[in-house]
């Protein structure tokens, strides 16, 4: 570990290892039918390399549809389809020849330090020729990064990915300073979501490169050489293979070159490196440079890390910070989830926050929901509610915490950290949640944690934020950057929504308790007295929030009951009438609503304890609808209270004793408190949104959020706490083992280790690339999810309904017998009379059943004795 720190602290001082140069020198010369300079005619080329018309217009039909090829020349054409993409991809990994039975020649690849396999592969001609000449021929660039894809089979733990062990990255090999390291973490997103993120990142890099009056980016080399983009895919099995075609089209991936193991030592991560100017939009349009166009994308240094096994997001971050970060030593690391699209100049705004504040350790931008064309997704109440929730969080919560200097959570989907700020204890605590370190850490790792700590690591970003602010001897702060915006997709169906919020709620609750219980560590930091005062104020605020969350279930029920009783129950004292159904009907309707409220709430416990959300969608949808209706009813009653109060109606406010009497009654009466709560809640939403010049969510999404407020308490909180034992990430997928070839080493005459690698001709590389581009640019079709209810789900659903029916019947009987409020529905007027009658019925029924059983026993005994006398011997 010390060696890793030493080397990461001086990434520009080491000499390039001769092994790496020898690898590049051993790369065979390119044999291709493509033109090698820009003056040659390419009208007959297989792919429209951007040379004949100097970058022809962008078209989604690249390569042109007029190209015909014999199916026998493409060994993969027969198997390409949405259904068989996994099988087809595996088949391409083991294919050794591109046409017929012809075998390719091989070349020797020397291993770095005798153990590290790192190979340079020629890229397709169309990709190589798409690089602008001003970059390709520049003295500041190295031609190899545009002509060859570098592949490294990392057979080590991320902590062992060091220069001493023979691992290196191109940006460090070329002695480049990395100012920004942008990490895109991926699980199983489709190619549209991935392209949305990657293209948005490349557009943001163009914004930085095109800065004109800058005192920083123009010094010490071109700006694009100071930025590295790292894509980290969490496992071969879960990843969408169509997404790999998109990456292959822009040049940062190739089929058939990955190795499952090196001499039996399994590959942990497959690392690809390439510098590209190509990009694909979410609509599958290929973006290529055009002649002297200032809007061209600059070269982008790419690292693609494809982990062999699914090992969760924390492990992906360990590859980022402990492996790539130590080699590149960036100033700022920006974290983006696949599917999140950074807005215009958003990454620049994040970086500027660090550049202008030397004590800033972490920052986040504004995340808003993806609403689709013409905001069509707002029709979905779940999407609309989440959109409003995100907006209010960005308008009220994040600015408040930023003012204190401690943002409790920097969303992993769109945030940034100063690399040297999180080094040390913050990352050490953060990585305790990595499952791959469980054996190494022992009791300090995930296996030695109790269920509370395991839930805490479901919101591991909160732990990192607290550890960063509390870092001993430093005064790092966290901030919210309003100018930086990111757009992300949100769950659109109840099962995905419940699974996501279960992880968020349990993780944030546990992490909040962690920060409160360990607040004394703040005193060891380097914060000044004023900052400590702010942090103490925030501590009190967080404790109040935790307390409100803990008692929210009872609080909402009591609030609902009180409002219904105030408005619906007639009172002789203040001479008000029952509303809205009159004196007689209003209490009855309210009691029915309360009974159903408790019934649906009870149902949530049964569903949460025994059923999967996917197996109980209908029950959850009915629950959502009912609680939304109840909330609408309560809102109507609340605004009726407001109208009555300001119109001088018969509400418990003092209008007869002047302003003093009115103010006194306003702050002491139940009606006044309801009015204060309404104005302070909804009023702050409206005023703050207008002040931030962002009021549109009030018109488009507030309806869904306000109607869905009881869902957060009665459904989400119940589901989260009932599944406290579940410490999974609530995602789907599996660890499919891909069949990749192995690398076997041999010894040369000089006893140097080498492997023999297929030396594929450039023509065959280009033919395979044509097929890849066709797959990548084909229109995306959303997969149709099979709505099949598993047999186990059907059993659990029946079990839940049976227990619920049994409980409700017993509860309803107890309510009817023992509650005075339902006297209008019964024959008697008091619960005492009903209880007496019920007690008599129970006694008579018990006695009758006992006598009946006794008579049956007597009959059996007499019958047996009588038959015994007359039975045959």
Swiss-Prot record:
Catalysed transformations (reactions): [(1->4)-N-acetyl-beta-D-glucosaminyl](n) + UDP-N-acetyl-alpha-D-glucosamine = [(1->4)-N-acetyl-beta-D-glucosaminyl](n+1) + UDP + H(+)
A GO biological process held by the record: chitin biosynthetic process
Highest taxon of source: Eukaryota
This protein's GO CC annotations: cell septum; plasma membrane
Signal peptide bounds: none
Matching SUPFAM superfamilies: Nucleotide-diphospho-sugar transferases
CDD domains to which the protein is assigned, alphabetical: Chitin_synth_C
Residues annotated as glycosylated: 506
Membrane topology: Multi-pass membrane protein
Keywords annotated in UniProt: Cell membrane, Cell wall biogenesis/degradation, Glycoprotein, Glycosyltransferase, Membrane, Transferase, Transmembrane, Transmembrane helix
Disruption phenotype: Reduces drastically spore production and leads to strong retarded radial growth rates. Increases total protein in culture supernatant over threefold. Increases sensitivity to AFP, a small, basic and cysteine-rich peptide that exerts extremely potent antifungal activity by inhibitiing cell wall chitin biosynthesis.
UniProt biased composition (Polar residues): 33-46, 58-72, 80-98
InterPro entries for this protein: Chitin_synth (IPR004835), Chitin_synth_fun (IPR004834), Chitin_synth_N (IPR013616), Glyco_trans_2-like (IPR001173), Nucleotide-diphossugar_trans (IPR029044)
EC numbers on record: 2.4.1.16
Transmembrane spans: 532-554, 588-608, 621-641, 672-692, 702-722, 802-822, 841-861
Region (Disordered): 1-105
Intracellular or extracellular location(s): Cell membrane
GO molecular function, one term: chitin synthase activity
Pfam families in the cross-refs: Chitin_synth_1, Chitin_synth_1N, Glyco_trans_2_3
UniProt record similarity statement: Belongs to the chitin synthase family. Class III subfamily.
Function (record text): Polymerizes chitin, a structural polymer of the cell wall and septum, by transferring the sugar moiety of UDP-GlcNAc to the non-reducing end of the growing chitin polymer. Plays an important role in septal growth or maintenance. Mediates colony spore formation.
Protein name listed in UniProt: Chitin synthase F
């Amino acid at each position: 570990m010390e060696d890793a720190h030493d080397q990461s602290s001086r990434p520009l001082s080491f000499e390039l290892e001769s092994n790496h140069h020898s690898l590049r020198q051993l790369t065979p010369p390119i044999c291709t039918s493509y033109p090698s300079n820009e003056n040659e005619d390419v009208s007959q080329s297989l792919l429209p390399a951007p040379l004949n018309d100097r970058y022809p217009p962008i078209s989604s039909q690249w390569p042109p549809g007029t190209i015909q090829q014999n199916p026998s020349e493409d060994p993969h054409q027969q198997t390409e389809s949405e259904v068989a993409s996994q099988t087809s991809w595996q088949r391409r990994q083991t294919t050794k020849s591109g046409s017929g039975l012809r075998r390719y020649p091989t070349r020797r690849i020397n291993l770095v330090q005798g153990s590290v396999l790192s190979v340079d592969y020629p890229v397709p001609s169309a990709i190589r020729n798409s690089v602008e000449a001003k970059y390709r021929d520049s003295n500041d660039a190295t031609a190899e990064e545009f002509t060859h894809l570098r592949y490294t089979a990392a057979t080590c733990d991320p902590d062992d990915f060091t220069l001493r062990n023979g691992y290196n990255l191109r940006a460090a090999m070329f002695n480049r300073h990395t100012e920004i390291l942008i990490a895109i973490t991926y699980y199983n997103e489709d190619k549209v979501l991935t392209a949305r993120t990657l293209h948005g990142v490349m557009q943001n890099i163009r914004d930085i490169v095109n800065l004109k009056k800058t005192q920083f980016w123009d010094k010490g080399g071109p700006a694009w050489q100071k930025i590295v983009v790292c894509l980290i895919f969490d496992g071969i099995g879960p990843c969408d293979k169509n997404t790999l075609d998109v990456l292959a089209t822009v040049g940062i991936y190739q089929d058939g070159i990955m190795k499952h193991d090196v001499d039996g030592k399994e590959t942990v991560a497959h690392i690809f490196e390439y510098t590209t100017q190509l990009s694909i939009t979410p609509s599958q349009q290929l973006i290529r440079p055009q002649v002297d166009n200032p809007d061209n994308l600059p070269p982008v240094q790419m690292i693609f890390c494809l982990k062999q096994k699914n090992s969760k997001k924390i492990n992906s971050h360990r590859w980022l910070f402990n492996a790539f970060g130590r080699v590149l030593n960036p100033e700022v690391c920006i974290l983006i989830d696949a599917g999140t699209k950074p807005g215009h100049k958003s990454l620049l705004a994040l970086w500027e926050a660090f550049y202008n504040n030397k004590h800033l350790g972490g920052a986040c931008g504004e995340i808003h929901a993806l609403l689709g064309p013409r905001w069509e997704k707002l029709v979905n109440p779940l999407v609309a509610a989440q959109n409003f929730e995100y907006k209010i969080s960005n308008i009220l919560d994040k600015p408040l915490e930023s003012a204190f200097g401690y943002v409790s959570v920097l969303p992993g989907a769109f945030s940034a950290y100063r690399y040297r700020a999180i080094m040390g204890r913050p990352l050490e605590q953060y990585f305790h949640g990595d499952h791959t370190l469980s054996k190494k850490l022992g009791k300090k790792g995930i296996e030695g944690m109790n269920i509370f700590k395991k839930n805490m690591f479901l919101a591991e970003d909160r732990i990192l934020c607290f550890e960063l602010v509390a870092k001993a001897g430093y005064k790092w702060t966290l901030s919210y950057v309003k100018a930086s915006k990111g757009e992300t997709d949100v769950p659109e169906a109840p099962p995905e929504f419940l699974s996501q919020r279960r992880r968020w709620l349990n993780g944030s609750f546990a992490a909040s308790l962690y920060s409160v219980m360990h607040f004394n560590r703040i005193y060891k930091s380097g914060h000044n007295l004023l900052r400590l005062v702010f942090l103490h104020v925030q501590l009190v605020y967080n404790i109040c929030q935790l307390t409100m969350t803990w008692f929210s279930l009872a609080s909402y029920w009591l609030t609902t009951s009180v409002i219904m009783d105030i408005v619906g129950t007639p009172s002789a004292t203040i001479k008000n009438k029952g509303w809205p159904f009159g004196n007689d009907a209003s209490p009855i309707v309210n009691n029915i609503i309360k009974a159903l409220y408790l019934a649906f709430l009870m149902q949530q416990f049964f569903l949460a304890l025994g059923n999967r959300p996917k197996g109980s969608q209908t029950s959850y949808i009915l629950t959502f609808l009912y609680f939304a209706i109840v909330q609408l009813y309560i809102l109507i009653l609340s605004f009726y209270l407001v109208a009555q109060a300001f119109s001088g109606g018969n509400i418990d406010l003092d209008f007869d004793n002047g302003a003093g009497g009115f103010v006194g009654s306003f702050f002491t009466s139940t009606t006044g408190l309801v009015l204060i709560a309404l104005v302070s809640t909804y009023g702050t939403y409206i005023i703050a949104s207008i002040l931030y010049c962002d009021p549109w969510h009030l018109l488009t999404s507030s309806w869904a959020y306000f109607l869905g407020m009881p869902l957060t308490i009665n459904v989400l909180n119940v589901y989260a706490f009932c599944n406290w034992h579940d410490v999974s990430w609530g995602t789907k997928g599996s660890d499919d083992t891909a069949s990749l070839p192995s690398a076997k080493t041999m010894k040369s005459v000089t006893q140097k280790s080498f492997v023999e690698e297929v030396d594929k001709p450039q023509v065959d590389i280009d033919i395979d690339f044509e097929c890849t581009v066709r797959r990548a640019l084909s229109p995306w079709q959303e997969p149709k999810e099979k709505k099949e209810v598993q047999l186990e789900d059907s059993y659990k659903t029946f079990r839940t309904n049976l227990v619920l029916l049994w409980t409700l019947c017993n509860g309803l009987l107890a309510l009817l017998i023992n509650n005075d409020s339902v006297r209008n529905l019964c024959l008697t007027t008091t619960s005492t009379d009903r209880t007496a009658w019920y007690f008599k019925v129970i006694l008579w029924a018990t006695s009758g059943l006992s006598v009946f059983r006794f008579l049956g026993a007597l009959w059996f005994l007499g019958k047996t004795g009588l038959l015994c006398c007359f039975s045959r011997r």
